[in-house]
Design a protein with these regions (language model features):
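Glycine-rich nucleotide/cofactor/substrate-binding loop typically near the N-terminus or early
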Residues: 1-43
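Internal alpha/beta core interface subdomains
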Residues: 32-133
């Protein structure tokens, strides 16, 4: 549904900087848990368009919560690993296996770069669909 993912405890847990006293105080005050791994599988917008679906079905496949989670995780790459698509699962698994279930800043930057690429591609596909209307 449309009204479930966009919650301040979720986004607070992703966006809170672990080295920022103010952020940490707010997390404690509002009982917000830290989230250090975000894995997203966006609605299949392009496949829905390609299937010849109705405009209503296409509109419903515009992912809002997922894309917001991707952007939040990528923004806080210093503290969060963002896995923006199923295509990234093998890469994450390889890193975790090699490094003992840990990531470093370079790993997180790489995932953030991939995340903004996924976000950009997704938004471009939506833009292109609207431009053809």
């Amino acid at each position: 549904g449309r009204v479930k993912t966009l919650h301040p405890k979720i986004f607070g847990g992703i966006l809170a900087r672990r080295d920022n006293t103010g952020d940490q105080e707010q997390m404690k005050e509002y009982d917000i848990p830290a989230i250090d791994l975000v894995i997203v599988d966006l609605y299949p917008f392009e496949q829905t368009v390609a299937s010849g679906a109705s405009e209503q079905d296409i509109i419903e496949k515009i992912d809002i919560g997922g894309i917001s989670l991707i952007r939040a995780g990528a923004k806080n790459f210093k503290d969060v690993v963002i896995v923006p698509s199923k295509a990234e699962y093998p890469l994450l698994l390889d890193i975790l296996n090699k490094k003992g279930a840990k990531t470093d800043i370079e790993d997180r930057k790489m995932f953030a770069e991939h995340a903004f690429g996924v976000s950009s591609h997704y938004d471009t596909a939506i833009h292109n669909w609207f431009a053809k209307k």
